[in-house]
């Protein structure tokens, strides 16, 4: 049986390309996306669920119905200027949404989680190439929200002895 990967934000640019590549490699792909910025035409999945990562009841239904082996989490608001004007929207969507997703995944026994973070967690780095060991000091609500999720994931996954990968795109 093929392993099942839940891709959040799978109707967006990076998420849709990732979903396609996962399918090409034989994984069963389930996309969860609210289509707030993604596109229905970009979806390539074995199953598409239109919904929001903040919807706890929906997440519970998904994890009860589908045997998810791993989560690849792209779903997020990501416009820096908008995050400055509406910071609480970014914390609600990016941080609260991630917390609900992480909690549901752990409760369902998912042991692998990949999180798409951002180079914005490094702030105004003074280097052309930013190394992973550079101090993280975001300078806007978008970067702060992604950094908060990184910290939350590290704590949650250490406590539960699970596998976590962070990608700074």
Residue ranges: model-predicted function:
Residues 1-166:
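N-terminal Rossmann-like NAD(P)+-binding domain of SDR-like oxidoreductases, especially those catalyzing
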């Amino acid at each position: 049986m093929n392993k099942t990967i839940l891709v959040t934000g799978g109707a967006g640019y990076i998420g849709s390309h990732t979903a396609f590549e996962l399918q090409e490699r034989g994984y069963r792909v389930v996309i969860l996306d609210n289509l707030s910025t993604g596109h229905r035409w970009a979806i390539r999945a074995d199953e598409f669920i239109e919904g929001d990562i903040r919807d706890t009841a929906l997440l519970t239904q998904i994890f009860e119905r589908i045997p998810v082996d791993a989560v690849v989490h792209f779903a997020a608001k990501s416009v820096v200027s908008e995050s400055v004007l509406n910071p609480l929207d970014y914390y609600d969507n990016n941080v609260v949404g991630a917390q609900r997703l992480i909690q549901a995944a752990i409760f369902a026994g998912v042991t692998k989680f990949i999180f798409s973070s951002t180079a914005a967690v490094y702030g105004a780095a003074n280097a052309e190439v930013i190394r992973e060991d550079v101090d993280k000091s975001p300078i806007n609500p978008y970067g702060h929200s992604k950094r908060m999720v990184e910290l939350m994931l590290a704590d949650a996954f250490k406590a539960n002895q699970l596998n976590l990968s962070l990608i700074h795109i």
